C-alpha cells in the first residue's frame, strides 16, 4: 500500500506505517490554502476554489503519472476530492474506487438536493417543485463554472457528465459512502454506490490527554473541526459565554490543529481550551457536544452515543444538520444567533431520553468499512463490471 497525499499529511501517513508519496512537495500548503478559507464560502469563493484547483491539476496529474509509471498500482482508492487521480487511472487503464464521506454531495436526480442551505425533504407538490428548481440550480452552477473554465477542461479532456447523466468525477467501478444509510433520506445514488459506514478510527489518541475534573456536574466538548480557520474565535466566544452562564459545567474546546497540539492548554475556571484533542480521547469522557456538523464529529458522536447541539458553519454542514435533526440525535442552532444556540443548548440538557441516538450508536458497530473495501477490491481485480 502506498498513500499519495500533500506535504501536510506526510507525518500522519508515516505514523500509520504506510509508505507515502508527497504531491507538490515544493508547495507544502497548496491544498490547505484552497480548502481552508478565511471566511464562509459563497458561489464566488466556490468558483475561485475550483479555478485554483484547476491551476494545480496539470502539475498534480504529471506527478501522479510519473509515480504510476515508476510503480503502476493494480487498483487505486481515491477520496472524492482527488479528481486528478481519476484522469490518470483512465489514461493508465487502472481500476479505481471513490471513497466519499459526504455521500449526499453526489448529484441527485429525483430527491431533495444538498448544498443549498440545508433543505428538509417534504412530500407535496410545492416542495417537489422546490427540489426540482434547486437541483437545476446546483447543476447549472456546475455547468457555468465548467463553461467559464472550458479551455482548461478541454486540455484535460474532461466532461462533467457521462452517458448516464452522472458525474464523471466518481469511479464507474465503485463508490464507497463513508456514512450510515440510516441517517440518509436519499435513495437515488448511482448503481455502483455502496454504504461502507463511517471511518472514525483514531489516528492520534495518544497525542494529548484529557483528564476530566470531577468537581463539575457535566462536561461539554466544543469543536468546529480542522478547516474552519475563520471560525475559531467564534467557537471560543460561544464557549466563554456558556461557561459564564453555567459555572457548574466544564466546557472543553478543541481548535482542531494537530500540528499545534503541543501548545499550552488554556485553563480558566470552567473553560479549558486545547489546540488539539482527538475525538476518541475526549468523547468517552464528556456528557454533551457542541459542534459544526462536520462528518467526522457527527459520526463520532453517534459512535460514543453523545447528544449534541449542531451549529452549521459552511459547506455540507447545513445538510448534516438536517439529517441529524430528522434522526433526533441533535438540536440544530444558527451560528449568528446566540439566542438560538442557548435555546438549543437548554433543549439538549432537558431532553432525558435519546432513544434513536442509542439505536444508531448500536447500528454504527455493524458497519465494517475495511471489510467492504477488501470485498470491492477483490471483486474488481477479478474482473468485476464497471
Task: Tell me the role of every PLM-derived stretch.
Residues 3-49, 127:
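Conserved nucleotide-sugar phosphate-binding/catalytic loop shared by glycosyltransferases and other
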Residues 34-85, 90, 132-166, 170:
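Conserved nucleotide-sugar donor-binding subdomain of glycosyltransferases
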Residues 324-328, 336-352:
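C-terminal "capping" alpha-helix adjacent to the active site of nucleotide-linked donor transferases
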Residues 343-386:
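C-terminal amphipathic helix plus adjacent low-complexity
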Residues 55-128, 182:
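Conserved nucleotide-sugar donor-interacting segment of glycosyltransferase catalytic cores
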Residues 179-288:
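Donor-nucleotide binding loops and adjacent catalytic segments primarily
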Residues 97-185:
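Active-site-proximal region of nucleotide-activated glycan assembly enzymes
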Amino acid at each position: 500500500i502506498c498513500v499519495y497525499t500533500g506535504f501536510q499529511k506526510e507525518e500522519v501517513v508515516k505514523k500509520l506505517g504506510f509508505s507515502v508519496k508527497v504531491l507538490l512537495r515544493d508547495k507544502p500548503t497548496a491544498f490547505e490554502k484552497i480548502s481552508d478559507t478565511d471566511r464562509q464560502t459563497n458561489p464566488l469563493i466556490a468558483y475561485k476554489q475550483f479555478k485554483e484547483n484547476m491551476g494545480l491539476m496539470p502539475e498534480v496529474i504529471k506527478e501522479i503519472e510519473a509515480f504510476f509509471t515508476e510503480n503502476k498500482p493494480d487498483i487505486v482508492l481515491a477520496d472524492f476530492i482527488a479528481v486528478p487521480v481519476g484522469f490518470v487511472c483512465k489514461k493508465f487503464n487502472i481500476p479505481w474506487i471513490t471513497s466519499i464521506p459526504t455521500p449526499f454531495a453526489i448529484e441527485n436526480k429525483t430527491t431533495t438536493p444538498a448544498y443549498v442551505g440545508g433543505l428538509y425533504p417534504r412530500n407535496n407538490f410545492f416542495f417537489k417543485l422546490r427540489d426540482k428548481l434547486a437541483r437545476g440550480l446546483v447543476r447549472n452552477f456546475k455547468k457555468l463554472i465548467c463553461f467559464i473554465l472550458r479551455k482548461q477542461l478541454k486540455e484535460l479532456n474532461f466532461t462533467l457528465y457521462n452517458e448516464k447523466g452522472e458525474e464523471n468525477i466518481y469511479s464507474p467501478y465503485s463508490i464507497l459512502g463513508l456514512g450510515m444509510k440510516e441517517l440518509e433520506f436519499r435513495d437515488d445514488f448511482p448503481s455502483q454506490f455502496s454504504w461502507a459506514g463511517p471511518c472514525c478510527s483514531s489516528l492520534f489518541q495518544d497525542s494529548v490527554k484529557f483528564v476530566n475534573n470531577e468537581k463539575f456536574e457535566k462536561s461539554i466538548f466544543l469543536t468546529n473541526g480542522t478547516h474552519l480557520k475563520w471560525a475559531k474565535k467564534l467557537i471560543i466566544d460561544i464557549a466563554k459565554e456558556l461557561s459564564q452562564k453555567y459555572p457548574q459545567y466544564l466546557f472543553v474546546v478543541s481548535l482542531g490543529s494537530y500540528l499545534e497540539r503541543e501548545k499550552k492548554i488554556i485553563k480558566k475556571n470552567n473553560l479549558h481550551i486545547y489546540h488539539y484533542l482527538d475525538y476518541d480521547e475526549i468523547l468517552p469522557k464528556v456528557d454533551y457536544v457542541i459542534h459544526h456538523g462536520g462528518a467526522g464529529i457527527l459520526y463520532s458522536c453517534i459512535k460514543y452515543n453523545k447528544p449534541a447541539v449542531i451549529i452549521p458553519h459552511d459547506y455540507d454542514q447545513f445538510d448534516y444538520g438536517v439529517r441529524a435533526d430528522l434522526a433526533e440525535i441533535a438540536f440544530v442552532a444558527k451560528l449568528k444567533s446566540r439566542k438560538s444556540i442557548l435555546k438549543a443548548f437548554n433543549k439538549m440538557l432537558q431532553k432525558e431520553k435519546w432513544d434513536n441516538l442509542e439505536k444508531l450508536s448500536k447500528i454504527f458497530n455493524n458497519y465494517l468499512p475495511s471489510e467492504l473495501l477488501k470485498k470491492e477490491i477483490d471483486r474488481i481485480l477479478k474482473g468485476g463490471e464497471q
